Swiss-Prot record:
Keywords: ATP-binding, Cell cycle, Cell division, Cell inner membrane, Cell membrane, Chromosome partition, DNA-binding, Membrane, Nucleotide-binding, Transmembrane, Transmembrane helix
Protein name: DNA translocase FtsK
Natural source organism: Brucella suis biovar 1 (strain 1330)
GO biological process, alphabetically ordered: cell division; chromosome segregation
Residues given in the record as ATP binding sites: G509, S510, G511, K512, S513, V514
Listed GO CC annotations: plasma membrane
Principal location listed in the UniProt entry: membrane
Length: 854
């Protein structure tokens, strides 16, 4: 093992980011100062209106032609009249929190716990009104109510109910004294003078450099919420804050002494020397700087001057390849998130309104785990190398990539070390590193093996962060799906139009249902009902039923397994019909078809084609006619099957046949399938399904066998659950992704919004089980005859039409079992429709096959 290694990190990007944060903080502070000045101006105007209040001025409660004497004119007269009517003399102290809030905005740049302080403000105003009503009303009071206004008199009726009358005299004074303490506490709490010890720090100030303006906020943060007893100290502190602000704004400050200047210069020089000095790395062979022996006077030699001693740095350690990469920053917000951050009051009527990002939970600001610091990750890398050496695996960690859930350690094994040997040590590595699980896999295209260890503290990935990212907004994918984040924290956006189908598997509680919801919401946030339609099949009747009624659905959520078979067969017929339309237009996929139809509609010209209708009897030349095609743009269709295992148990053969045809041919027709199951066994995920679903997602499974069934290799059993997945794209490359979380309440809000945009246009033919007149072409092209009451009549029709009667032929044509087909043939023989089998196994049809139906 190499010692004394320290990775070098680029500082240019950090300096640029720091400058941007400083500039953003400067602009933000100026905005807050303007807001504070505006609020202070409004407070001063309110005080002026109350100071010049005259009961004879015209207002809402007093209609008169007298001239307005209020200093603020008619608006001031109306405001002062309403304030005195409702709060009385309590209107004046009720303005104190507004004045303090304006100062806080100018000084600190934010007001913490604004909701609680607003409630405290209302409570203080009401209590002050009650206290004012306790005072005796003088003869000069022009109002017919008490000094506390309407609210004050109403509050005093509560103790009056128990006392038998309105409080007066000593009782009123006692009530005023009792209410004084909570009124003052509410007033000081609402003003922000007390109760700042536990309030949240403004997130915008965390990343900015500390300035002189922030010193007051830091000093105030030392106060506790229980400081309500020290009113005098709080008032003194407010006066000092105001004085310091005025001095700083006017440029008047105390003169600094020479010693203070000297100390500041010394600190600046020391910090500059520390920043520019080369970093010294501790080595295992030399004591670290913190392990130096204590100073001893006996070790000093008076004969040798201290200044003459020369200190030499330790020899530079040997360079290593290992380095700790910075975690990927949060996804940059896209144009849509920026537009929704500034709400508009103008809405377009008659246009489908896409769901807003505000329906989703906002990501919480979390501090970076100290266990993911560069030093801690470097130490874990050295420890992991030691663990591998204990098991006889030589190599070195060349890269460390921390992420929101796991950290990837890239191991470059020594020559002669087999990858299978390292992969087999996954459980031992997890035990030695005290981890819940460890996943070991070869990194494609590199001479490295990835070792993924879970972080001590897991970060949650939010769907709003994914949908608001610039990667999702500017993605060129036709049907973009926000799958989650990689190990590095980079967003993963997949296009189901290129997959073209996806198989999802995972046990209960692994996050499979949440992933299905995120896929659906990804489509709903980008596609209108004219662009994408959905067919949802949910045999469990719980997961997808919440989407029932949205305009994107082609049919209500199918919960009956028998109806699910019919819906899949309708999808197959729709696929074949789309291919016939595209063949007539002469295009190869749905995008070309929609482009051709849209261009024709824009020009106002019908789509026509030339077809041959026959030959001229005289000349023998071909006759051509022009056929006009009445076509409309076709939307994408996404079929979502939440539980495949239940469908396979009810009608496995029909389901497998329909899914096979869709998976093989439906891509160009714009039909895509998302199939999920929680039982990834070979009888559910058959070889036919696996061959036609190259894109697969595996969540946590219980065994290595299930992992091999889904992905073809182990590793899914080592996942952490709760959205932790392995994403295998079409090329077979497996990528670990952490899926985003979306709650049920968020889904309900989005569904309610979509229901307000319009009603769905259902197609009844999707779930109608109509008999196939042609007998079908196999399990995917016929009705579910095995579930019919009597398929005997259909079998007779097939025999009379095709003039073939055998057990295997009936079995193939009707898609039924061999035993049932044999019973039908025996019944036909008993009724005289067919004869007995000859030596070759063929039967003669005894019933005449004329024009008359049987």
């Amino acid at each position: 093992m190499r010692q004394g290694y320290s990775p070098s990190y680029p500082l240019r990007d950090e300096r640029i980011t720091e400058d941007r944060l400083r500039f953003a903080n400067l602009v933000r502070r100026q905005v807050y100062i303007l807001l504070g000045l505006g609020l202070l101006s409004l407070t001063a105007m309110a005080v002026g209106a109350l100071a010049t209040w005259n009961v004879a001025d015209p207002s809402f409660s007093h209609a008169t032609d007298n001239p307005v004497t209020n200093a603020l004119g008619y608006p001031g007269a109306v405001f002062s009249d309403l304030a005195m009517q409702f709060f009385g003399l309590a209107s004046v102290p009720a303005l104190l929190p507004l004045a303090v809030w304006s100062l806080l905005l100018m000084i600190r740049g934010y007001i913490g716990r604004i909701a609680r302080r607003s409630l405290a403000w209302v409570g203080a105003a009401l209590l002050f009104a009650a206290i004012a009503s306790c005072l005796a009303v003088p003869q000069s009071w022009p109002m017919p109510i008490g000094l506390g206004g309407v609210f004050g008199d109403m509050l005093l009726r509560i103790p009056g109910f128990f006392l038998g009358g309105f409080p007066q005299g000593a009782i009123a004074s006692a009530i005023a004294l009792v209410l004084a303490f909570p009124a003052l506490w509410f007033c000081f709490f609402a003003s922000g003078i007390i109760g700042r010890g536990a309030e949240a720090v403004n997130p915008a100030m965390l990343s900015a450099n500390r300035s002189a303006d922030d010193e007051f906020a830091d000093e105030d943060a030392d106060n506790e919420a229980g400081g309500g007893f020290h009113f005098i100290g709080a008032l003194t502190h407010l006066v000092l804050m105001t004085t310091a602000t005025i001095r700083r704004m006017t440029g008047l400050g105390r003169r600094r002494s020479r010693e203070d200047d000297f100390d500041d210069m010394r600190m600046v020089r020391r910090s500059a020397e520390t920043r520019n000095a080369p970093r010294r790395e501790p080595g295992f062979g030399a004591p670290a700087a913190d392990d130096e022996p204590p100073f001893d006077m006996d070790d000093m030699d008076d004969g040798a001057p201290l200044a003459g001693q020369e200190w030499h740095d330790a020899p530079p350690p040997r360079a290593r390849k290992a380095r700790v990469e910075q975690a990927a920053p949060s996804p940059k917000p896209g144009p849509r998130a920026q537009r929704e951050a500034q709400p508009s009051f103008l809405k377009d009527n008659g246009i489908f309104e896409m769901p807003s990002l505000h329906f989703l939970a906002e990501p919480k600001l979390v501090q970076r785990d100290p266990a993911l610091s560069k030093d801690a990750l470097e130490q874990n890398a050295r420890l992991l190398e030691g663990v591998l050496e204990d098991f006889g695996v030589r190599g070195e960690i060349i890269n460390v990539k921390p992420g929101p859930v796991v950290t990837l350690y890239e191991l470059e094994p020594a020559p002669g070390i087999k990858s299978s040997r390292v992969i087999g040590l996954a459980d031992d590595i997890a035990r030695s590193m005290s981890a819940i699980a460890a996943r070991v896999a070869v990194i494609p295209g590199r001479n490295a093996i990835g070792i993924e260890l879970p972080n001590p503290k897991r970060e949650m990935v939010y769907l709003r962060e994914m949908l608001a990212s610039r990667d999702f907004e500017q993605s060129k994918a036709k049907l973009a799906l926000a799958l989650g984040k990689t190990i590095n924290g980079e967003p993963v956006i997949a296009d189901i139009a290129k997959m073209p189908h996806v198989l999802v598997a995972g046990t209960t509680g692994s996050g499979k249902s949440v992933a299905i919801n995120t896929m659906i919401l990804s489509l709903l946030y980008r596609m209108t009902p004219q662009e994408c339609r959905l067919i949802m099949i949910d045999p469990k009747m719980l997961e997808l039923s919440v989407y029932d009624g949205i305009p994107h659905l082609l049919t209500p959520v199918v919960t009956d397994p028998k109806k699910a078979v019919v819906a899949l067969k309708w999808t197959v017929r729709e696929m074949e019909d789309r291919y016939r339309k595209m063949s007539k237009v002469g295009v190869r996929n749905i995008d070309g078809f929609n482009q051709r139809v849209g261009l024709a509609q824009k020009k106002g010209e019908p789509i026509a084609r030339t077809v041959q209708t026959g030959f001229d009897r005289n000349t023998g030349e071909a006759i051509y006619e022009t056929e006009e095609l009445d076509l409309e743009p076709m939307p994408y269709i996404v079929v979502i099957i939440d539980e495949m295992a239940d469908l396979m148990m009810v009608a496995g053969k029909d389901i497998e046949g329909a899914v096979q045809r869709l998976a093989q041919m439906a891509r160009a027709a714009g039909i895509h399938v998302i199939m999920a199951t929680q039982r990834p066994s070979v009888d559910v995920i058959t070889g036919t399904i696996k061959a036609n679903f190259p894109t697969r997602i595996s969540f946590q499974v219980t065994s290595k066998i299930d992992s091999r069934t889904i992905l073809g290799e182990q590793g899914a059993e080592q996942l952490l659950g709760q959205g932790d997945m392995l994403f295998m794209a079409g090329g077979g490359r497996i990528q670990r992704v952490h899926g985003p979380f979306v709650g049920d309440d968020e889904v309900e809000r989005i569904v309610q919004h979509l229901k307000l945009q319009g009603v769905p246009e259902y197609l009844d033919a999707i779930t109608e089980d109509e008999d196939d007149d042609e007998g079908g072409s196999g399990p995917a092209g016929t009705g579910n005859l095995e579930d019919s009451d009597d398929p005997y009549d259909q079998a007779v029709a097939v025999v009379l039409r095709d003039k073939k009667a055998s057990t295997s032929y009936i079995q193939r044509r009707l898609g039924i079992g061999y035993n049932r087909a044999a019973s039908i043939i025996e019944r036909m023989e008993d009724e005289g429709i067919v004869g007995p089998a000859n030596h070759a196994g063929k039967r003669e049809i005894l019933v005449p096959t004329g024009d008359d139906d049987f």
